């Protein structure tokens, strides 16, 4: 199933609000300007007030574009060594702090997308202590990779928010285990190969993640970071709760949306059937363990053993 998230502002420009009530009637389950932040605090406050009245969440990409302008990776020792312009962690954390304050003011449910730094986690932890309606997510690649992986100037590692330090990665894993991070989301961002096979500075941000998310996260189970039960919960039940959807759970009378997987089967990304039209992942050609065997949607088997049915 695909559930639409509607734009907060027209053309995601950050200035003029969309017809949010009409978009809800049209089937939207939340509001977001996707990979663009709403820099205007007044506009964001109004959006939150309307979303609160509609009982809809705001899903925010948190980035101060005045701090991040021109940056291509996390600012730090590695960016300095590589001669690449950095994006400070504060580009994310300062916007999270602003939106947490606005969420407390308006009472909206604020969902913070793809958290990447320990600084951001501290603000989110404080917000939850204040009992603000705040949830957050982390991507598999931020749980697996760091800025040091960019040493070879491979643009497949170029994402936004950028890969953090080892300390950020470890903090994200702890926050996931402790429940501070509510869900795991892929931030799936396909690109044509020409948009990645170029100089790092000119390459587009983003990597694909739908087909590698499960095996990557299963490595966290094997490493003792999180239990299998909790991992499944963070990828199914909890995302559904955030969006107010009556899906994601196995129960009598529930919609039969089920994924069957073998946690021990190894496969090579790219050698096995690949369904995304893009290949922009640093895991291409890597051996991963854990493979989806079948997918059931609405009680109908739509995928089995490498074939779409």
Q: Regions from the language model: what does each represent?
A:
Residues 199-202, 255-307:
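C-terminal cap of metal-dependent C-N hydrolases
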Residues 41, 121, 144, 192-194, ...:
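Glycine/Thr-rich phosphate-binding loops of Rossmann-like dinucleotide-binding domains
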Residues 81-109, 156, 177-184, 189-264:
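His/Asp/Glu-enriched, well-ordered alpha-helical/loop segment
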Residues 15-184:
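Histidine/acidic residue-rich metal-binding segments in metalloenzymes
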Residues 5-8, 33-35, 61-63, 115, ...:
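Fold-independent oxyanion-binding glycine-rich loops
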Residues 3, 79-82, 138, 154, ...:
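Residue-level signal for pocket-adjacent positions within structured domains
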Residues 1-15:
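Metal-cofactor-binding active-site regions of metalloenzymes
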